């Protein structure tokens, strides 16, 4: 069974965490960063990119790079604001009124759930790589103010990514889990969550392992990106006044403005003024145009006054629903990177009257809480009870277009509520149930989650039939509605999908497409890695050949060097032709050839360590002879002689007595063996004289050595081990070599 992880699917960045050893831990991605940009792109070659790689092509390829997808999940096209639709890529409406993302590179459209699924799959693969085992389940966080269709769309995204979504968890609730896990005292916590695209406020009571949500509120169309857009509009208006060009009409210029605005917002959190320089932002027929300006913190805060007012309303509503006063709050936990802005922190101080707690990492705390919830579901974390609430009221439409609420907002979940309804006309045999979510009194002002019909009602006067409608919300916040005719017992149950979410058939099709594309991506990745390995091996082989040439000379292992050079040429040719099969064969051949060369190099190094000073002389002699190195090493022994031939200086192996060599005058007994001096064979005592025919008095000359068949002195010398071109050493001057029969030239005793 695979692991269950916690995932914070954010508008700007996403984070994944897991329980390890009873403690939550954030997993870094392949780039070594703990947060992954929530960006998906398609390169010009058709490769799908997720995360930092996709973010890098935002400026150069804006139409095929998709960011801020979370704002489109589970929403109809008519529900989007103009600011939400102002993105560098194309967002269109499909025939059903849902949102579709256009990808010109692939000539197809994506649902927001599909794009979100690519991000989730990327995070799951990173976790699998780190853990060494597959990730099959996940707890995914959503803003607390997400409605039912948005939650269902998030669940669909997880299914498309191949994950079993164990729980849909509210982000403020997850943050409270991470904050209060080790706390045993009772506290009232206010979680202020300002992310990239959403804003939530939740009030919780934490103590003794119980996390009870008292109230929640928020705005799903308010986040840090809205602060960026204020800077973008300010820059664009300034440039329009100065140059008469609206940069917002140029996709690349707009993306550069967005990146510059985000950078300026981050810098203004630490400094009071920042410079914005965008050279070559656009060009006219005459010259290129540059954008250079300066933005102060006070100017930035003045641009965002209305956004701060929008944050005050959910904050006050959450306190009111929890029936608490600001002084009743014990701790304020800031969640989301946008809470680092000084004006946001000052807003919290002014409304709550308490300094915000900044001990937690606002970028990672939600994912850590999701991992804790995953540990609770897996049984790794015990003695933790989480009581969440539904963020919005649920009900149905009645006569006159009025909404009848069955489950008020901030009701603890899971929950089941029922009510009895009747027909509006005489002899009515069918009832249509219209499910709504929201806080407005009239049905048209609320979110429509879906409709279904209950048929087979017996004809009866108006108001006589009794239809029991039940709303059931599970721990994930997913709504299930059932209608029961109490007269006939006929019942119909439906899980609300939401008008803007995908059908089951579409989800299954997208799951197959995602798996197919994932397989194609794996194959493409393997192909790229193979080419990288080939290029790396080529560079290593060429460097190795250069090193061996410098260390051992150009003639060392010449055949193996030629084999490697030939294989390198073949490998480069296969790389140029993109021949994968030939590439595999050439890679294996080059690896084998390089291994053989390294083996011979290692053997030569071992021999050099044993032979020391004489090895360079041996190499010189071998190069003069033109012999192969290995044959040369095999045929020469440690004494410098041929190990396959008998030692010509070994008298015990000669069949013909050697009489020509006179050693009786010297106290040294034949110390020369090859060119070396052998100390152990040196004796200071004279040899016994050769017995003569005169009774051993030494007056009779010995038998001379026969001339025929006797080699000359130079021919009888063994080859020199040091490969020197100098003539071999001659015997000591006190000795004579009986070279002939001339008695006048010979010396006798």
Curated annotation (Swiss-Prot):
Basic and acidic residues compositional bias, start-end: 643-653, 661-694, 711-724
Comp. bias intervals (Acidic residues): 740-749
Chain residue ranges for the region called Disordered: 643-749
Pfam families: HSP70
Induction details: By stress conditions e.g. heat shock.
UniProt keyword terms in alphabetical order: ATP-binding, Chaperone, Nucleotide-binding, Phosphoprotein, Stress response
Coiled-coil portions: none
PROSITE patterns for the chain: HSP70_1, HSP70_2, HSP70_3
NCBIfam families in UniProt: PRK00290.1, PRK13410.1, prok_dnaK
Job of this protein: Acts as a chaperone.
Similarity field: Belongs to the heat shock protein 70 family.
Protein name: Chaperone protein DnaK 1
Organism: Synechococcus sp. (strain ATCC 27144 / PCC 6301 / SAUG 1402/1) (Anacystis nidulans)
Chain's gene name: dnaK1
